Amino acid sequence: MRRPLRRVTVVLLWVALAIGVAWFYDYRRSMQSLWKIRQHGKIVVLTENNANSYYIYKETPMGFEYDLAKAFAGHLGVDLEVKTPGWDALFASLQRGDGDFIAASMTHTRKREQYADFSEPYLSVRQHLILHKSDHSIVTPAGLAGRTVHVREDTTYQQRLEALQADGIDLQLVLHRNTPTEELIEQVAKRQIDITVADSAIALLNRRYYPDIRIAFPIEKEQPLAWAVRKGDRGLRTEINRFFDEIKENGTFTRIYNRYYTAVDTFDYVDVKKFHQRIYTRLPRFRPLIEKAADRHGFDWQMIAAVIYQESHFDPFAQSHTGVKGLMQLTRVTAEEMGVTDRFDFEQNITAGVAYLAKLRHRFDDIEDPRTRLLFALASYNIGYGHVRDAQQIAKNMGMDPNRWQSLKEVLPLLRNREYYADTTYGYARGNEAVRYIERILTYYDILKQKKAV
């Protein structure tokens, strides 16, 4: 009796050992890519080359997905390499090992799970119809009957529109193999096609470039965006999830998101439409002086142009009831300080205004990040250096980092409330206007960056 029992025990031990060995090798294989990434000191991201994910401007890489991927590489302590094989080749490139993960504002769907494993969602979006601003003929999905909709092939847009067709809506669907959604949006703006579909993030970002479009109602419930890794790559997937948890907790995700999308939320069609026109009708007259002054003080000339448009709409004779005058809306005190004899002389105005902005930026040399230092200087240009320092103190009192733009953005509006400004040095200020001021400048700046003819 004991011998059969012993035999069963031995068999069970061998089975357990086999399972353990199989688990060990499976676990080792699932962790191998992360180990190799750290060994080689580099991670390769597969993404899209567009305004939403990744693009190069003056030799500087930018884009929402790029910034997230760059932060992830920093989280791992490795360098980042970017590859853009094209939307249709993303999964194939991942499976071949051309890249380690996909970061391309990709929605996580069941169909795509057969090609890759996905991280936890980091953002949710909704699909919207995109029409010309003059087209108000469609108010419900049923209004698509008899209309033609253009979308990129093999996207969730195609899947949703086919579902509407299956529900009985007689729409005509035109699929584009190699045409990015951004180009279809441009075609709507130029009246080359009537309708396309884009998710909310892509739609918002592109509306600033194509103010003639209208973002209509959503045609789908919220969908999750996630990063993709090779099937079975649990190690990298787990690390990505840990990374997103970390950056959402410490505010990094919010800062990156706000850089690309917050200013879009304050979109004003009439104002942006005028800006697009005045880039060609007014800006050329002042551009040489703007470039000269910007170069002297180490600014991007397009940022200075954006500031000037926010201040005066490129009108050299602009003046306010507060007494500020000229292209950069100089106060009398600032003009005297900077040696300006005529604030309506646009050469004097630009030269002095840019020099003064550089002076303000220098006063924030304790802030290491150049972009943050610029934003603090712009806030000071708008409401005054003293108020910005007051806001920093409030942020510090609230346990926030006073040298972060996200902190300043949250506390500046508090300068309107007595319970906060009563104990400050400079008192009351309309800090919310300073926040909106900077958001508009960033919108104008981004438009100028994307303008190929400027």
Curated annotation (Swiss-Prot):
The subcellular localization recorded is: Cell outer membrane
The answer to whether UniProt assigns keyword Lyase to this entry is yes
Cite the CDD domains for this sequence.
MLTF-like, PBP2_YfhD_N
Per its UniProt entry, which superkingdom is the organism in?
A: Bacteria
Look up keyword Membrane and say if it applies: yes
Q: Which PROSITE patterns match?
A: TRANSGLYCOSYLASE (PS00922)
Give the source species.
Desulfosudis oleivorans (strain DSM 6200 / JCM 39069 / Hxd3)
Which GO molecular function entries does the Swiss-Prot or TrEMBL record give? peptidoglycan lytic transglycosylase activity
Into which family does the record put it?
In the N-terminal section; belongs to the bacterial solute-binding protein 3 family. In the C-terminal section; belongs to the transglycosylase Slt family.
GO BP terms, alphabetized: cell wall organization; peptidoglycan metabolic process
Q: Where is this region: LT domain?
A: 266-454
Q: Which HAMAP family match?
A: MltF (MF_02016)
Q: What is known of its domains?
A: The N-terminal domain does not have lytic activity and probably modulates enzymatic activity. The C-terminal domain is the catalytic active domain.
Q: What UniProt keywords are attached to this protein's entry?
A: Cell outer membrane, Cell wall biogenesis/degradation, Lyase, Membrane, Signal
In its UniProt entry, what is this protein called?
Membrane-bound lytic murein transglycosylase F
> What are the start and end residues of every segment in region (Non-LT domain)?
25-265
Q: How does it sit in the membrane?
A: Peripheral membrane protein
Q: Which reaction does it catalyse?
A: Exolytic cleavage of the (1->4)-beta-glycosidic linkage between N-acetylmuramic acid (MurNAc) and N-acetylglucosamine (GlcNAc) residues in peptidoglycan, from either the reducing or the non-reducing ends of the peptidoglycan chains, with concomitant formation of a 1,6-anhydrobond in the MurNAc residue
GO CC list? cell outer membrane
What InterPro entries does its record include?
Lysozyme-like_dom_sf, MltF, Solute-binding_3/MltF_N, Transglyc_AS, Transglycosylase_SLT_dom_1
